[in-house]
Regions:
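Short, Lys/Arg-rich cytosolic juxtamembrane segment immediately N-terminal
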Residues: 8-18, 152-160
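Short, Lys/Arg-rich, polar N-terminal cytosolic tail immediately upstream
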Residues: 1-9
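Post-HEXXH active-site segment of zinc metalloproteases
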Residues: 156-187, 247-257
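Select subsegments of transmembrane alpha-helices in polytopic membrane proteins
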Residues: 13-25, 164-167
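Transmembrane alpha-helices and immediately adjacent membrane-cytoplasm interface residues
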Residues: 45-70, 91, 95, 99, ...
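Juxtamembrane "helix exit" motif at the C-terminal ends of alpha-helical transmembrane segments
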Residues: 25-43, 169-190
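Cytosolic-facing loops and C-terminal tails of multi-pass membrane proteins
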Residues: 33, 188, 198-226, 235-336
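Peri-catalytic and regulatory segments of divalent metal-dependent proteins
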Residues: 60-161, 165, 262-265
Length: 336
């Protein structure tokens, strides 16, 4: 049975929160094992301490601004006179989302892509490439802007930044514990009695296992959360535009665009609506921050009650003053 729009949105939110909670649990488990190895009677201090550390890191991430990201991308602030259609579309979607109008930035790049950033929903920023403005029609541009507006409304930027930094603590703690064991021996200092010593050894073994597995699982969970937030932004965009086909067509055009991104940077690649220069492999589904585009398109078209193959229709004529549409072509399927 197909999910309704609200059901899909709620499902994606639940999934992302569950996955994020598992990362916090992994962090707490690793902290417990480390403390239990050296102070078995105070293992609970490791649990509380590691989770408190994660909270502090998350709060620090909350105060990081978007200026560095915009600088890396080479974005410039747009004006209404220079990009009237983009300005109008952003304003429309801000009204639909019930948010203040975000600042608009343009990236001088012939490829098609876009991202959102900002500390909180009322301080949002949307950046798009010049290639996107030239190659998408108004419906498709509206779908892309709605997707980025949804990231702002859903507080995804702050959520994912905090999550990434919290997840990043896990390999740091794991590496620290392995080094401590390497120099101090299995189980560290023994307790005053045999029971404490045995418990310390158990914690040490568990800690070593977690040191190997926890960083891998944390990374996979982080990537899974990112994919869920992309699905959530797609569904929320459909809610804002009431026209899922616009975003679906835009996603396919962006994916099929042969122009490489000149301003490509690995530090910001996960922020874009479609990951630039994404390499496909057997493990692409697990190691990708974004869902497969065909899966996103199918989900969008199911919301519209349409067949996923039907959306690549000719682009209708645009009114005077709108973005000039590219020549009408039949879009081929995306090849693996």
């Amino acid at each position: 049975m197909k999910k309704t729009l609200q059901e899909q949105i709620q499902s994606n939110r639940r999934a992302s929160l569950i996955l994020a909670s598992l990362i916090v649990v992994l962090l707490g488990a690793l902290g417990t094992a480390i403390t239990g190895t050296y102070a078995p009677d105070y293992w609970w201090a490791g649990t509380l301490g590691s989770m408190a550390l994660g909270l502090i890191v998350g709060l620090v991430a909350n105060f990081s601004g978007p200026s560095i990201v915009l600088s890396i991308a080479g974005a410039r602030e747009a004006t209404h006179a220079q990009d009237q259609v983009l300005d109008n579309v952003v304003e429309e979607m801000a009204i639909a989302a019930g948010l203040p109008k975000p600042k608009i930035y343009v990236i001088q790049d012939d490829t098609m892509n876009a991202f959102a950033t900002g500390r909180r929903p009322n301080e949002g920023v949307i950046a798009v490439t010049t290639g996107l403005l030239r190659k998408l029609d108004r419906d498709e541009l509206q779908g892309v802007v709605a997707h980025e507006m949804s990231h702002i409304r859903n507080d995804d930027i702050r959520f994912m930044t905090s999550l990434a930094l919290t997840a990043g603590l896990i390999p740091l703690l794991a590496d620290m514990f392995v080094r401590m064991q390497w120099w101090g021996g299995l189980g560290g200092r023994r307790g005053r009695d045999r029971n404490s010593g045995d418990l310390s050894t158990i914690f040490a073994v568990v800690g070593l296992l977690l040191s190997v597995l926890a960083p891998l699982f944390a990374r996979l969970l982080e990537l899974a959360v990112s994919r869920e937030r992309e699905y959530l932004a797609d569904a929320s965009a459909a809610e804002l535009t009431r026209y899922p086909e616009g975003l679906a067509r835009a996603l396919r055009k962006i994916t099929l665009d042969p122009v490489p991104m000149q301003s490509f940077n690995r530090a910001t690649q996960t922020m874009y609506i479609v990951k630039p220069r994404a390499l496909k492999s057997r493990w692409a589904g697990l190691s990708s921050t974004h869902p497969e585009v065909e899966e996103r398109i199918a989900a969008l078209m199911s919301l519209a009650g349409s067949d996923p193959e039907r959306f690549s229709r000719p682009v209708p004529p645009m009114p005077t003053g709108a973005i000039e549409a590219p020549p009408v072509v039949e879009l081929p399927p995306i090849l693996d």
